Amino acid sequence: MPDPTCDDVARRMREGGVAPLVAAGWASWKAGRWREGTGGADGVLFDLASVTKPVLAVGVARSGLSRTDKLGQHVKEARGTPTGGLPLELLLAHRAGLEAHVKLYEPLLVGGAIDRGEAFERAARARRVDAGEPTDSGFAPIYSDLGYLLAGEALARFEGATDPDEVLAARVIAPLGLEGQLGSARQLEARGLDLRTIAAPTEDVPWRGGVIVGRVHDENAWAMAPTGAPGHAGLFGEVSAVLRFGEAVLDAVKGRPSPLSGDLTWLVRERPGGTLRAGFDGKRAPGEGPTSAGTVLGARAFGHLGFTGTSLWIDPDAEIVVSMLTNRVHPSRENVAIREARPWAHDALALRASK
């Protein structure tokens, strides 16, 4: 439903130079049903960047893949590496001792090609030099794209799929009825959508041919699956679709009927050592520094941000969901105005949802 608060948030973001395109939305559970409001560029498909990670985690939870399975059971390139013997849950919870990022796409910069097997092995060997020794709950939490790249590949191979987005389409997107509103580039284009006209443009990258439109912005995701979603990034979505995903996650966590039925509680539970959970992040406690979630969402809120300027937050106590999607990297990632804008924007959406 069109909502003035969402339109106002989008307008302020645009006029403040945060991003050329902004879509905002909120949802609240009241009187046994979900109420929603959206505004701004609703209907535009945004590159969700790392907001793909919660979808991947839910896909793992809803598959037959066990979170206690070792990575090397499913990804042969990981066998004999420091990561191969770790359970998938630690990869999803950013507690596998992996580097945050490795430039797996580097061969493309010099006209080479990507050897996917070599890339997966390289990712699995990327143990941080300061990782230390693991405890029963894994290594100290360090945010890592690589863990999701590897967990996504484990999911794909377990399900007999080419890439994780095929599994997510069946396990998450189809049950939500969001085909055409949420998916990888190839899935959306297979439904006849022209992403060149309905996807928000992202960065102007000369080595990739200029302004990126309808293809994932993340370099590693593009290198590993040019039109797919390897696990850490690659999905596109409308703000209404991201809200619907958040609603279904909260319904499942609360034990209500949900298209995403199954045990998702292990994904969102708090873990020792930091705010990072499996597929989601949590709010920093007062005194631990600023939080992009703002001040209105409760202390137990969980969600995720995306590098392209996207976000999803879920408050399980107030039973509200907020999302903001932007293309803040257009035309350049150097625009970081969103860092100051996110808290007040999330506050405005959460206040509206609370009414």
Residue spans of the language-model regions?
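Short, glycine/proline-biased beta-turn/loop segments that scaffold the active-site neighborhood
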Residues: 67-82, 175-176
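Short, surface-exposed loop or secondary-structure junction motifs
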Residues: 19-21, 29, 33-34, 81-300
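Residue-level preference for non-acidic, small/hydrophobic
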Residues: 9-10, 24, 53-60, 91, ...
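Alpha-helical scaffolds flanking conserved acidic
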Residues: 45, 70, 85-89
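A short, well-structured edge-of-sheet supersecondary motif
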Residues: 7-48, 58-59, 67, 107-110, ...
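Short, positively charged
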Residues: 1-8, 288-295, 348-355
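Structured C-terminal helix/loop/strand segments within mature extracytoplasmic catalytic/sensor domains
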Residues: 303-355
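Hydrophobic (often cysteine-bearing) scaffold residues that line and stabilize catalytic clefts
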Residues: 2-5, 48, 52, 56, ...
